Amino acid sequence: MLGKMILLPLFVLLCHSLASASLAYRGADISSLLIEEKAGIKYKDVNGQAQPLENILKANGVNSVRQRVWVNPSDGSYNLDYNVKLAKRVKAAGMSVYLDLHFSDTWADPSHQTTPRGWSTNDIGTLTWQVYNYTKEVCDTFASNGIDVSIVAIGNEIRNGLLWPLGKPNNYANIANILHSAAFGVKDSTLSPKPKIMIHLDNGWDWSAQKFFYDSVLSSGAKLVKSDFDLIGVSYYPFYNPSATLSALTTSLKNLRSTYGKDVLVVETDWPVSCPNPAYAFPSDLKDIPFSVAGQKTFVQRVANVVAQTPGGIGLYYWEPAWVQNAALGSSCADNLMVDWRTDQARTSLSVFGTI
């Protein structure tokens, strides 16, 4: 009887541990942190105590930080030096680093994939070498600074290609060769252990779009093969398309895993605390979630459950929860933050990372 009494609490403790840590990567993109601090922002925890943002995140269950990397931005924001500085703080706080290489001097997304200044726009052979050398340089720089990198995404939301015009979707062989070169920039770097290599597309709920891209690059006859990358990342935003249901996301993630054999992650997502005038109708199976701090927790938990219940589903990252000078985060919703932009104080929704 005594043995059973001892084992029962241990079993309950083990179950609680498994329930609260089902995702290997429980992350946030805080790329804007150094810019916000330069503007005088001083972050506070939920109790109103001033603390570095990375410490606040860690205390709330975040274990990984996503950082966007631009090649040669005009003001230095998000360049390599910027990201090394940020990553040192992330490492010191005990979280892993995930680098999101945009291969651009500015934002890269489905509508913008501008080739960096000085990179070739008319010769794919030259461009692929530039991609390889740049990717290797980034990774080598992190290695020389003693910073391990868990994940490197080779491009950001590249459903419509990358490094335009050579990497436009009218030439999937070019896209495939660019991705192959980027992957080997990571593989040939001095980082040890080697980071996982990710390909990242937007509209993660749209299985047909995901399938079309991967089938196109993998059957293009170019150099990219499945062994070049380890992870598939998707963006999942609820406020851009009423078709972006959790049900559709579930189908897409499961199909991505079963078709291509890669672990899958939702690497960008948000939920509003205020959205009085949405530009699009919200998906039908999300309409019961309120636009509130409590609603943020519910939404993240539901998305995390979709990921966790997908074979090979290993992570979720919230996009820019603390960018207090940009509360809308590019959407038609007024406020998608987990930090109150009026007070710079963490909202209680941030604690959701300790539950997923």
From Swiss-Prot:
It comes from Neosartorya fischeri (strain ATCC 1020 / DSM 3700 / CBS 544.65 / FGSC A1164 / JCM 1740 / NRRL 181 / WB 181) (Aspergillus fischerianus). Its EC number is 3.2.1.89. Endogalactanase involved in the degradation of plant cell wall polysaccharides, and more particularly of hairy regions of pectin. Belongs to the glycosyl hydrolase 53 family. Residues 1-21 form the signal peptide. The gene is galA. This is Probable arabinogalactan endo-beta-1,4-galactanase A. GO terms for biological process: cell wall organization; pectin catabolic process. It holds the Pfam family Glyco_hydro_53.
